[in-house]
Amino acid sequence: MAIAITKENIDAKVNKSSLPVILKVHATWCGPCQQMNPIFEELEKEMSSSYLFAELNVDDARDVSIQYGITSVPTLLFIKNGEIVGRETGYMSKDTLIDKINEHLG
């Protein structure tokens, strides 16, 4: 299961991660976010040895959402060594998400 990110743990879990991070920013009321959940979980099972999968609920962590400039959900942030190296917004199929992971973190 993806790590739930909060204001309290973002530095330790995301910024200091030894693995590249795929951070899914979502909301419980967001339909496309809910559609992506099984895809994100499936990829986490397949790729967890290479990437850290994390998620941020915009309603639970508003400060962090503002810090990252989140204006819509779902948004995926690709983070390497504490720096955002890519950002994608909107629903993505599994194949598209794999392509984006390879593009930004591969």
Question: What kind of feature is each model-predicted range?
Answer:
Residues 1-52, 60-63, 67, 73-75, ...:
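Proteins that catalyze or organize thiol-disulfide redox chemistry
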Residues 57:
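Conserved acidic residues
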